[in-house]
């Protein structure tokens, strides 16, 4: 089942009945694009949630945020494959195909929070008592944003699963692409033609946003418990992101479980399917262990 978040478009004042409207447009007017790898980009009016319900639900649901550097969403390896795995275990899934920020930094989180509102509204109907969030790479940043920047109990996830997540926007930790796609390209902030006062004002805002969207800064005792996975040899998103999030959770007395594998790189997704005929799956040696530990963790928190 696919639910459009903004059936009248993002320029409308109101969106889905269960949502709080688009509030803001990302300015994208061109057509949405997709490719054979399952990537989808230029999402605007078509922002949506794909709902997957198992034959027999165990009471859990996960709102999934695929990765893609805030430029596209990897809807196959970090979306549909997740839904297949989860529903086979009785867990309902909502894959969010959120609008691209294009420098409108609030937009992805607005869409995820509206997805939570929709799912909470229909939870009893679907037999759901616990709704968490899961994210990969930049989608991990979005999932961590949902976990730390929620606005009420409806939008607060009951738990988080973060897979090779971006956590900090510190230039030392994160690639320029993800940061620029979320906050806007450097020239938007560093235009030397601006008057001095305007330039200084923009620089202050930029550094404020870097701090705000470095999500470890918002972790406290009310942050949802988390399951975190990363690989030591990840060159795109260094493992320090996960360590930073985990450490702040522990310092705040929040339950957390972290697994760091020595090899696997970045973007290995939730299934080995994508690797068939396309090179070596560097995470193949650890997939079974990863799936077993995640399944056990989800089962344990369901019983709490």
Predicted regions and their residues:
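N-terminal cap/lid segment of alpha/beta-hydrolase-fold proteins
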Residues: 1-57, 105, 284-288
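Mobile cap/lid helix-loop segments that gate and shape the active-site cleft of serine hydrolases
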Residues: 25-34, 169-218
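Short beta-strand element of the alpha/beta-hydrolase
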Residues: 59-67
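Catalytic nucleophile-loop/oxyanion-hole region of alpha/beta-hydrolase
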Residues: 73-83, 94-130, 283-286
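Primarily recognizes the serine-hydrolase "nucleophile elbow" in alpha/beta-hydrolase
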Residues: 114-178, 210
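Short beta-strand/loop motif that positions the catalytic acidic residue
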Residues: 222, 228-230, 234
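C-terminal catalytic histidine-bearing segment of alpha/beta-hydrolase fold enzymes
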Residues: 229, 243-304
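Conserved alpha/beta-hydrolase "acid-adjacent" motif
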Residues: 235-244
